[in-house]
Amino acid sequence: MKTTAKRTVYYQYPVELVWRGIGIGSDETTVDPLNEEQYENTEPDRGTVFTRAIEVKQNEVFHFRMKTWLFYSEWRIELSPVGPCETKVKFTNTIEYRSLRGFFYTGFGNLARSEVKAFSRQLGQKIEADFQKNRPAPEN
């Protein structure tokens, strides 16, 4: 069973700030990468998630796969500058359930939609916090 959710959000920030909010190139991001063979041959336990980047183009695309004990998930996040201070972000999340149990356990197929909605909202909050933190002090 597969479900797909798509959502387009406009953020009132430049594309570089949105990209940093996603976490790519951030000082906070730590990764222990798996190669393709390790990813395919490793099975996650409960509470474990394995992630594999498929395509990463700075300020444009972040495409990755996730594997949990219940489902496989494929995310594609596409960024497009609309102007100097606005960015269009298209989120696509496709979830393939590993069993009927996973389908029921995660809300009868509603997981893709709720994940896209939550991720886009959290990204907006993270971008705003980063903007406020790095905002130049007003001149007196």
Which residues does each PLM region occupy?
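Short beta-strand segments that buttress and anchor functional surface loops
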Residues: 38-45, 62-68
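Short Pro/Gly-enriched beta-strand edge/turn motifs at strand-loop
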Residues: 34-36, 56-63
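Short, exposed beta-strand/loop patches in secreted or surface proteins that constitute
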Residues: 29-31, 40, 51-56, 80
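Hydrophobic pocket/interface hotspot
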Residues: 18-28, 53, 62-64, 89-91, ...
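Beta-strand/loop substructures that line and gate deep hydrophobic ligand-binding cavities in soluble
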Residues: 68-125, 129, 134-140
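Hydrophobic ligand-binding cavity/cleft-lining segments
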Residues: 1-37
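A short, structured loop/turn motif at beta-sheet edges
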Residues: 12-16, 54-59, 78-88
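Short, surface-exposed coil-to-beta transition loops
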Residues: 4-6, 46-51, 71-76
